[in-house]
Amino acid sequence: MSFVPGQENAGSRSSSVNRAGNGILKKTTWADQTERGPNNQNRGRRNQPKQTATTQPNSGSVVPHYSWFSGITQFQKGKEFQFAQGQGVPIANGIPASEQKGYWYRHNRRSFKTPDGQQKQLLPRWYFYYLGTGPHAGAEYGDDIDGVVWVASQQADTKTTADIVERDPSSHEAIPTRFAPGTVLPQGFYVEGSGRSAPASRSGSRSQSRGPNNRARSSSNQRQPASTVKPDMAEEIAALVLAKLGKDAGQPKQVTKQSAKEVRQKILNKPRQKRTPNKQCPVQQCFGKRGPNQNFGGSEMLKLGTSDPQFPILAELAPTPSAFFFGSKLELVKKNSGGADDPTKDVYELQYSGAIRFDSTLPGFETIMKVLNENLDAYQDQAGGADVVSPKPQRKRGTKQKALKGEVDNVSVAKPKSSVQRNVSRELTPEDRSLLAQILDDGVVPDGLEDDSNV
């Protein structure tokens, strides 16, 4: 007995099917009303079956076979179409797990001309065919064929063909593709009819122009079972929504002084054991200064809190709530009553002590040890360093100018000597003596030496 996807048995379908003239049970769908409307608007021409991408003319490689399921269209370039083992077979009523085997066929769609005259190729669309049907009906499961991706369920016997009848488009509409829970749809692809299908939106607009009765009937028949697989488009949709609102999803939110103050106050309003320190509310504001009883945290980690890049690996060592209560020594201690503002309030402390044991086989062991050694009792090093380093003296305005002025005042400046004094105090060099002897031999006394002869 051959199986028909979407049909469990003829007896269980009374109100949702119409009997055609040839005795074939035909399902009345929203597509029947939109594509083959009852108003007979084709002016006497024969009703044509709804064309799919596999039968459209001038659409690349024409496939003369109808798939039982709607296609999966690629919308991002460079993405690979593949499924994990045991996944990828569309589910349909009436098809047992043993027959869930087949292949996805790549249909190369047509190209179109852009306004600037360039040819642009549409990204391909994939259609599913059961093993032994479709354009590669004679191929065996796993054959290396370009544009074919083989899929099968874990219970299917891939050595035999699937006992599935070919789809007659005049009797059966294509079933919206949906997968078993847990199936991961390839990234960069979407299921036709899952919300991004242009033909669906155009058909919906046509149905709205046919009066209120047809609109109501069309909307009721339009309810198709949605695919259980959600394409990886959450980031894209969020970015589009934010762009519509005038916000940029790629830019981080700017933190102002007012917002930082609000974040800090919100953290401090929580109970002490529920606080999470960060850049806006550092560790010491949440839990107090470091000391013998709170001895963890270096300068960088105290400033960043849980925003420190090293903190996540330390969080792996933190106990769970159950480990805290059942793996620690707990003691309930009553402290002094509340302060003057609330003297009737009783204050208790749940004191605890325990240990976290790990060894060198723990992933990231060396990094954990390094971070622990840097942050345990780090307050001691910080305190010691503060005592050793002397504070930087503050510069007083005008000190340097006054010092320079004092140095100038302390310098004694001698009065310049006359030309006679300079000549008397100066010793004659051998060159001077030879020149002077030559002058005296000539009998010419130079000006300025007449009076100096007596000196």
UniProtKB/Swiss-Prot annotation:
Q: Which CDD domains match?
A: CoV_N-CTD (cd21595), CoV_N-NTD (cd21554)
Specify where the region named Disordered lies, as residue ranges: 1-62, 159-230, 271-292, 384-428
Q: Where in the cell is it found?
A: Virion; Host endoplasmic reticulum-Golgi intermediate compartment; Host Golgi apparatus
UniProt domain CoV N NTD: residue ranges: 64-193
In terms of one coarse class, where is the protein primarily found?
virion
- Decide whether keyword Transit peptide is in the record: no
- Keyword RNA-binding on entry: yes
Q: Which residues bind RNA?
A: R109, R125, R167
In this chain, where does the modification Phosphoserine occur? S170, S194, S390, S425
List GO terms (cellular component aspect): host cell endoplasmic reticulum-Golgi intermediate compartment; host cell Golgi apparatus; ribonucleoprotein complex; viral nucleocapsid
Looking at the record, the residues that make up the CoV N CTD domain are 260-383
Q: What is this protein called?
A: Nucleoprotein
Q: Which gene is annotated as encoding this protein in its UniProt record?
A: N
